[in-house]
């Protein structure tokens, strides 16, 4: 992995009691040795694999102002990280779920892009066996379950300040509150809505097929082509590019898919991240509620599965063998 660490600092938040969250500040930067590089490579991998929300700094963001000073050399990285940890403590202390943790600030380069990653990492206890086969307790950073993480694409931020996607953050296991606290600390607002972009893409595909008056099978085959491209991009960690997608798809009528999307005003970005859950709707129908969960391939609608809109009734002809076996055993037949 081509990841080069420029500067990295660690500090700590210690929860003394229910009302007190203390700060322990390190006096020097961490050396970028092999252990540190391995840790950052793992954190980068874990973060890159997770679903993220996008944002941008507010005009009055203290963190953004301090980061600009650090980038210009008016303030060193250690001082920047120490002051930011204090602000982080002040914001986190407002929430009842506040816990301590190791606060990490790392400025690094990956594939010619500069990043600043900020995270609060929890420590976990485990057991280890030494060479004499004695057991002892050990502590480790729980990187795989890190959920308080934000990353700033410094290259994008400095070269394209009007961007709505240079800042990313995780939603977190405890839900919306983590997002709120981190956005308050960063003094940022949500930017590019990835799910909305993917929903817009699905609508554009549906309208494009309808405009061309495709039959059911032709329409589903076209949707499958869209899904195949998008899924390949997702697996490769790449974004959906409208122009590239249009080149992959057969032209329906006089306009290709990109021209149609632009003229019809779907407000799609030239490229945007793929959202797995939304894209799945291209090839499947799924829903749950009231103790019922249903998921089936779109091709089955009208063949083995029939929906009566008037009575809101779904009829399934031919149940899966494992489901049929359960039903038979439960009915005593």
From Swiss-Prot:
Localization (cell): Cytoplasm, Nucleoid
UniProt entry keywords in alphabetical sequence: Cytoplasm
Main location: cytoplasm
NCBIfam families: PRK00378.1 (NF001557)
Any single GO CC term annotated in Swiss-Prot or TrEMBL for this entry: bacterial nucleoid
InterPro entries: Nucleoid_associated_NdpA
Family per record: Belongs to the YejK family.
Gene source species: Yersinia enterocolitica serotype O:8 / biotype 1B (strain NCTC 13174 / 8081)
Single GO MF annotation: single-stranded RNA binding
Name of the molecule in the record: Nucleoid-associated protein YE1421
